[in-house]
Amino acid sequence: MLSKKEILDVLKSKDIPKDLLEEAFKVRKFYSGYYVYLRALTEITNICRKSCFYCGIRKENASLKRYYLKFDLINKLFTNIKKLGYSSIALQGGEIFSEKHYFFLYKLIKLAKDKFNYEITISFGELPKDVLEKLYFLGAKRYLLRFEIISPKRYYLFHYKDKFHNYENRIKTLVLLKKIGYQVGTGNLIGLPFTFIKDLYKDILFIKNFKPDMVGIGPYIPQKNTPLFNYLKEGINIFSEKERFLLTLKLIAIFRILLKTSNIVASTALITLGTKFYPLEKVLNLAFKCGANVIMPIFTPSENKRLYSLYEDKYFSEHEKFYFAVKNSDFIPVLDRYGNPLSYYIRNQKSCKL
């Protein structure tokens, strides 16, 4: 177990300490072996009611063309994904509060579970309790909701303080998701302007105590149509791209050591930033050795995926390239198993169905 001093020393170090990397890799091999679970990700809409100051699909971004994928198109995507051998999918989109949207999600989850028998991860923001319960009942067993930054004071540096952006509701929703029975994924945004190492430590402490079944973290990458981008143009101090990349790898290693049995995602943002410095195989090898054991290739149609512009220069890769990049990074890509985390079975005392 890592002490506060050890964690702070790691975060302040210029590189990833060798002993941290060795311990994280040791824990990873014990609980996950060399397996990397692939989830086929589809971003069904870039419509969102929120206006987070760092996010490219914020409601106030009037320059962004909005889309909402049709049911028949998603059905075809699911069919193609199944042909490739996937057993797990992830569905993501902006936060929308409307009965029409809820019923579309119900229909989608029912299709994914009843027709294709997918294990389903969803990420659609802070939806109402009854909607979250019904989505779970229909077959969506995993939910990703990042808290972004755990300090309420810092949280409101990057969000309006209104009914759409409520820190307390965000945390309450995380607790609710776990109570409903979801495998809950959460995480922070690393290296935001106006944040410091001490803020990262608070984020780490929250995740350690919350014990999520999945950790989904990523480095902050600016998006030109956001308020934060304007601050950066004015020369506001920020962690460099290399620092944000290394900090993300350090946090992956820290979480692997602290949580042991949870799944940890090598996020698209991490890959986007990392491939500015290294080839894809090298980035994945580093992430997996630090403890990541999940990646999510994007299956959003090409005409839509660039519109899901959370940040600039997002890395896009076809299934085949990702699959072989995992193999070439000396790990084993897994499509035909659900890849449920051991933490979920331990907490619920269920028999293990990986």
Predicted regions mapped to residue ranges:
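N-terminal pre-triad scaffold of radical SAM enzymes
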Residues: 21-61, 66-90, 141
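Hydrophobic positions in alpha-helices of CheY-like receiver
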Residues: 108-112, 177, 255, 259
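Generic structural signal for well-ordered alpha-helices
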Residues: 40, 74, 78, 105-110, ...
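Catalytic cores of alpha/beta
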Residues: 128-135, 193-207, 272-289
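Core AdoMet radical
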Residues: 59-74, 81-105, 109, 113-174, ...
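Active-site-proximal loop/turn and secondary-structure-junction residues that shape catalytic pockets
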Residues: 42-44, 95-97, 124-128, 149-151, ...
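Conserved, mostly hydrophobic/aromatic
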Residues: 24, 52, 145, 177, ...
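Auxiliary Fe-S-binding modules of radical SAM enzymes
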Residues: 1-15, 76, 82, 208-354
